[in-house]
Amino acid sequence: MKVIEGVVATPNARVAIAIARFNNFINDSLLQGAIDALKRIGQVADDNITVVWVPGAYELPLTARVLANTGKYDAVIALGTVIRGGTAHFEYVAGEASSGLGSVSLNTEIPVAFGVLTTESIEQAIERAGTKAGNKGAEAALTALEMINVIKAIKA
């Protein structure tokens, strides 16, 4: 029986991080968590990490697709925060970001790690950006690295 499992140490990986400016006081923590995980755990060189800032979470899928289609990156990490408010805006933005990023990954065969927080409150977002609930940016980075290796192993 052949079993394929990915590892996270990927020193030669080329990774793009697409990050939303909206709610940047939370997203900055996600970014720091992602970069720390890429460098410290994944052993990715600083020169192999590209950060692209976009206005909000809604713009992440298009940006991820353009990055994936360049052929310059082994994975894309999407980071952002969508917090529920008093209108239906949350459902539209969160839904489009989620389905759009999944579509990019399926259509390009480049891993797109989902590091977009979708929370009910600012407090929940802060918890998921490095306090009680860990750092979802770091988790997304580790997912991206593991998927790079899984896909390489499948195609080998």
Curated annotation (Swiss-Prot):
It comes from the Bacteria. Its EC number is 2.5.1.78. Belongs to the DMRL synthase family. It comes from Serratia proteamaculans (strain 568). The gene is ribH. Keywords: Riboflavin biosynthesis, Transferase. It catalyses: (2S)-2-hydroxy-3-oxobutyl phosphate + 5-amino-6-(D-ribitylamino)uracil = 6,7-dimethyl-8-(1-D-ribityl)lumazine + phosphate + 2 H2O + H(+). Catalyzes the formation of 6,7-dimethyl-8-ribityllumazine by condensation of 5-amino-6-(D-ribitylamino)uracil with 3,4-dihydroxy-2-butanone 4-phosphate. This is the penultimate step in the biosynthesis of riboflavin. The active site is at 89 (proton donor). Forms an icosahedral capsid composed of 60 subunits, arranged as a dodecamer of pentamers. This is 6,7-dimethyl-8-ribityllumazine synthase. Pathway: Cofactor biosynthesis; riboflavin biosynthesis; riboflavin from 2-hydroxy-3-oxobutyl phosphate and 5-amino-6-(D-ribitylamino)uracil: step 1/2. The keyword Hydrolase does not apply. 5-amino-6-(D-ribitylamino)uracil binds at residues 22, 57-59, 81-83, 114.
